[in-house]
UniProtKB/Swiss-Prot annotation:
One GO CC term on file: extracellular region
Subcellular compartments: Secreted
UniProtKB keywords: Plasmid, Secreted, Virulence
InterPro entries named in the record: LowCa_resp_V_Ag, Vir_assoc_V_ag_sf
Organism of this sequence: Yersinia pseudotuberculosis serotype I (strain IP32953)
Protein name: Virulence-associated V antigen
Pfam families: LcrV
The keyword Secreted is annotated on this UniProt entry: yes
Length: 326
């Protein structure tokens, strides 16, 4: 997404430099190269200059027309695509706008332009904008912004929730041994955290596509002996000691913890695991609230778009009915 030049020309230029000309609306315009050449022939300099009255961030002044590729991007950013129907209303409107831009560039005595001023002068001539285009652009931009943010939040929340689920499996195993007053081995006699059944999965392929599996496959493994065969597992200790998770590594772990009413190291271990996962639980709650908010905004943008299209269609239909009735 390219930030508006009106708010911060430096950010506008930075964003333009990150994209290819082919990604901009007017890259295929039949007059793009002609306009670039006209700016060069008239020795027009377009620059960005820090204005303390408008700009919140200080940036270095820069003549951007020294870079022909950047000049082409600036023009392609606002230049519309050629009309598909030649000679139609849109094509005539577009050609008249381009004609006005050419006349302006050829006749203006001023060859030194600040980017904001240059864009302000040519924008409404160069584009065939209508008010409905502007409204649609604002709504669609809002949808895209909130849609992207929602997708990123969903991915992050899925990862956080998966890690929290693994902690809940560990906590359940600890609680089982607390209830029985026994000893939990978290190393070579540990439950295998790679067991899909622990997370409610019955299909191996579905489990391998899950967020839990994506976390666990990054963990170190422990080799255990099952009869005459060796097997690799992700033990509780492997998981807790690993830095390859959001909550980081938990150090100074023993291989096993026993219940003892006088010095209950198993209870202390349970508390340690709970304390380790508590910030993660808080973060999941925070991200869930953010996702709910951003989803609401996204849905509002869709609703606004639907209402606008319905209203636009209704107005156009009435105009057509009035015209056909005359």
């Amino acid at each position: 997404m390219i930030r508006a030049y009106e708010q911060n020309p430096q950010h506008f230029i930075e964003d333009l430099e990150k994209v290819r000309v082919e990604q901009l609306t007017g890259h295929g315009s039949s007059v793009l190269e002609e306009l670039v050449q006209l700016v060069k022939d008239k020795n027009i300099d377009i620059s960005i200059k820090y204005d303390p009255r408008k700009d919140s961030e200080v940036f270095a002044n820069r003549v951007i027309t020294d870079d022909i590729e950047l000049l082409k991007k600036i023009l392609a950013y606002f230049l519309p695509e050629d009309a598909i129907l030649k000679g139609g209303h849109y094509d005539n409107q577009l050609q008249n706008g381009i004609k006005r831009v050419k006349e302006f560039l050829e006749s203006s005595p001023n060859t030194q332009w600040e980017l904001r001023a240059f864009m302000a002068v040519i924008h409404f001539s160069l584009t065939a904008d209508r008010i409905d285009d502007d409204i649609l652009k604002v709504i669609v931009d809002s949808m895209n912004h909130h849609g992207d943010a929602r997708s990123k939040l969903r991915e992050e929340l899925a990862e956080l929730t998966a890690e929290l689920k693994i902690y809940s499996v560990i906590q359940a195993e600890i609680n089982k041994h607390l209830s029985s007053g026994g000893t939990i081995n978290i190393h070579d006699k540990s439950i295998n955290l790679m067991d899909k059944n622990l997370y409610g999965y019955t299909d191996e392929e579905i489990f391998k596509a899950s967020a839990e599996y994506k976390i666990l496959e990054k963990m170190p493994q422990t080799t255990i002996q099952e009869g005459e065969t060796e097997k690799k597992i992700v033990s509780i200790k492997n998981f807790l000691e690993s830095e390859k998770k959001r909550t980081g590594a938990l150090g100074n772990l023993k291989d096993s913890y026993s219940y003892n009413k006088d010095n209950n190291e198993l209870s202390h271990f349970a508390t340690t695991c709970s304390d380790k996962s508590r910030p993660l639980n808080d973060l999941v709650s925070q991200k869930t609230t953010q996702l709910s908010d951003i989803t609401s905004r996204f849905n509002s943008a869709i609703e606004a778009l639907n209402r606008f299209i319905q209203k636009y269609d209704s107005v156009m239909q009435r105009l057509l009915d009035d015209t056909s009735g005359k």
